[in-house]
Amino acid sequence: IPDLASSRSTLPVLTKGPTGLLGPRGPYGPLQRFNIELSARGPAAVVGVLGKSFDSWLTKLGLPGPQGRPGPPGPGCRFALSNQCIKLAVEFAGQSKFSSFLANEGKKEGPEGEEGPRTEFDGAYFAGGKFPVVGKPFPQLKVFHAEPPFPTSRSTYGPSGSQPGKKGVVTPFKGNQPLKFNDFLVESDSRCPPDDSSFERSPAVSGHSSPATLNSRMKPAGFPGKGNGAPLKNGIASDPLENLKNRLGSCFPDVLDEPPTSPFFTGPSGYTSDGLNKTPTVSKTLTAAGDPGPGAGKVLESSKTDLVALQGEFQR
């Protein structure tokens, strides 16, 4: 199993999606005329609407064509596993249930600290070349000898920011509780649609948890480090999705900028609601719509024709 932590990559798995959904209804068929004898009732009103005489007062209005051909197979979706869980995913192929055997350690180093607060100092220099700092002096401000003319305006400077973060707390994963495979699986959503922007989402399948429950069985990783600057969002992000990205670090892809809106496993060959009873084929029914079908008209029966509606059709 490759170690993906250093390469900051994810485990790409491409699976062929199911057959696409049927396309939308076809357009209306062409207008056709019939040679029908004018009756003594009704046609005069139609003639008055059109402003001219004609030999057929019944027009074949094209009805919607048949549904389009099925779309192409879906492209499948890439999903990502944290690299500590790759072995778990491989071992799962031959097991239906298992107990946790993988220690998921927290991140050992926090991210870089943010830039520290800026502090104002007076630009008037002492004769010795040093300048007084209003407030607490910072060691990053170097003492230097100024050349005349000495500035007298007040300027705002801050210490050098982006200090390295401190090491986070390592929180090992407790390995004595049963897990489900989808506790470690997060399916990307925003990068999976096909090139054609018109695609259909599969209906939601009950029984699947949302990506925010990824941490339901995982102990949190080390909190982000605090640099010499301001702390990062009180040490941990408040947004659940951002929280996961901070915890998993390099093992979490950037594809989850938008939370997925569909369940983890969809399609006829995917997992059932308990995530344990079928072969691990993960796919997502994202397919392009089919081509519109050709129009096919249908003769309207004259005895059932509503002249008022027919006039509206002619006006349209």
Curated annotation (Swiss-Prot):
Kindly state which keywords UniProt assigns to this record, in alphabetical order. Answer: Chitin-binding, Glycoprotein, Secreted
Q: Which GO terms describe its biological process?
A: shell calcification
Primary location class: secreted
A Gene Ontology molecular function term for this protein is: chitin binding
Recorded protein name is Nautilin-63
Q: Which GO terms describe its cellular component?
A: extracellular region
Highest taxon, organism lineage: Eukaryota
Q: What does the PTM comment of the record read?
A: Glycosylated; contains mainly glucose, galactose, galactosamine, glucosamine and glucuronic acid.
Q: Which spans does this entry mark as compositional bias, Polar residues?
A: 152-163, 207-216, 269-278
Question: Where is region (Disordered) located?
Answer: 1-26, 149-173, 189-238, 259-278
* Entry's localization field: Secreted
Name the organs or tissues of expression. Answer: Component of the acid-soluble organic matrix of nacreous shell layers (at protein level).
- Protein source organism: Nautilus macromphalus (Bellybutton nautilus)
Query: Where would one find the signal peptide in this protein?
Result: none
Q: Does the keyword Secreted apply?
A: yes
Listed Low complexity bias regions: 10-26
Q: What does this protein do?
A: Involved in nacre formation. Affects morphology of calcite crystals in vitro but does not inhibit their formation. Binds chitin.
Coiled-coil residues: none
